[in-house]
């Protein structure tokens, strides 16, 4: 089901394919006609709400598990906070039990850089997410490694 959802969001063309196609167009209008179905047409808050529905999650459970401030998190879901920080979205991803790939898709949709394995802090987060660690456990390891915690 999740793959179908991602397929709906990002359609069939890979980002690399789209980047290569962009080289062949003189105007956006031409590109858009051919690739309209590959364009993301959801806001971050719409995407978050769709994730909740798709994964059968409750906002309150996600917020608690993600160790997020309630009012801030509800603002992310409602769209009031349209540009949350990378760390807040990572915490939300952990609360939703998203994979690293799903988290990176969420970060990109928000206009943020994805988790990058060449960066020490990101590597710590990736390893711990892969091992289904909690925000508290990830923060503990980040702190022990001299890195900034998530919250």
Model-derived regions: residue spans:
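N-terminal flexible/basic segments that precede or flank functional cores
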Residues: 1-43
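A short, Lys/Arg-rich alpha-helix, primarily the initiator
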Residues: 25-59, 136-150
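Key DNA-contact positions within bacterial/archaeal DNA-binding proteins
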Residues: 60, 71, 101
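Recognition helix of helix-turn-helix/homeodomain-like DNA-binding domains
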Residues: 67-84, 109-111
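DNA major-groove recognition helix of helix-turn-helix/homeodomain DNA-binding modules
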Residues: 87-102
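Short amphipathic recognition helices of helix-turn-helix/homeodomain-type DNA-binding modules
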Residues: 102-132, 146-147
């Amino acid at each position: 089901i999740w793959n179908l959802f991602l397929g709906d969001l990002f359609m069939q063309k890979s980002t690399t394919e789209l980047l290569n196609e962009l080289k062949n167009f003189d105007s956006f209008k031409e590109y858009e006609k051919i690739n309209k179905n590959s364009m993301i047409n959801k806001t971050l808050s719409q995407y978050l709400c769709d994730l909740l529905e798709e994964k059968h999650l409750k906002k309150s459970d996600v917020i608690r598990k993600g160790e997020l401030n309630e009012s801030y998190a509800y603002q992310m879901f409602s769209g009031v906070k349209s540009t949350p920080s990378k760390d807040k979205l990572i915490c939300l991803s952990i609360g939703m039990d998203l994979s690293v790939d799903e988290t990176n898709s969420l970060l990109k949709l928000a206009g943020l850089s994805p988790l990058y394995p060449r960066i020490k802090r990101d590597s710590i987060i990736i390893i711990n997410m892969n091992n289904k660690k909690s925000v508290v456990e990830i923060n503990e390891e980040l702190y022990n490694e001299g890195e900034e915690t998530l919250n």
